[in-house]
Amino acid sequence: INLYKLVSQSHLKYYRRRPRVPKSVFLEHRDGLLIGSACEAGELYQALLRNAPEQEIARLVDFYDYLEIQPLGNNAFMIADEKNDTVNSKEDLIELNKKIVRLGEQFQKPVVATCDVHFMDPQDEIYRRIIMAGNGFSDADNQAPLYLWTTEEMLEEFAYLGSEKAEEVVITNTNKIADMIEKISPIHPDKFPPVIENSDRDLKEMCFQKAHEIYGEKLPQIVEERLNKELNSIISNGYAVMYIIAQKLVHKSNEDGYLVG
């Protein structure tokens, strides 16, 4: 339920160019959710980049349920970034990932290796390139390997941690997190239509009233059977309120002099 609430608020209340929610709101609805430290744009990684004090790092780590490290190619763009003076080589990126691993050990937080997947297969990067170019990104042609890596690829990528630690972050911990997550549907199985009192009754009365105006006091059997069949389908599926809303809108528009087609 909290996840649905956050998704709704991110789109309806806090939307600004993209869905988002303040951290304070996140905290209000945290129950039942697992929060990871995210990619290089996450606050933990950014704090490490600017060599934040240990106290601040500890506070940030404490907030998360698990910490994330990602393939070097995901963050290789920082090596050539003139605004960044912390990362100058592949070795610097390795050291950042190792720091996160050490923090996980120090604060007893599971560390998981994630791909930051933006597309399924390597060849699909062309679609992200097109989208980024259309949004004005000057570096759209420099695509990071943000596809879904295989287990073997991830183990090879994180071999610098040692085989035992690589298996822990790639396989063991990721499965632990996955096992903690229940299966949910992104769309709730219930319909949640708006509520207007007595919609079912009112729709039935309006339909039969109109039918009697057209066919007289006694309805032909074929008309009555068809009317009951249609109404039963609408009402039993919870859609009566939709028809009532449409009727009210059309009636109000006509009343105000606007033709509705």
Regions found by a protein language model. Give the residues of each.
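Phosphodiester-processing cores and adjacent nucleic acid-binding clamps
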Residues: 1-261
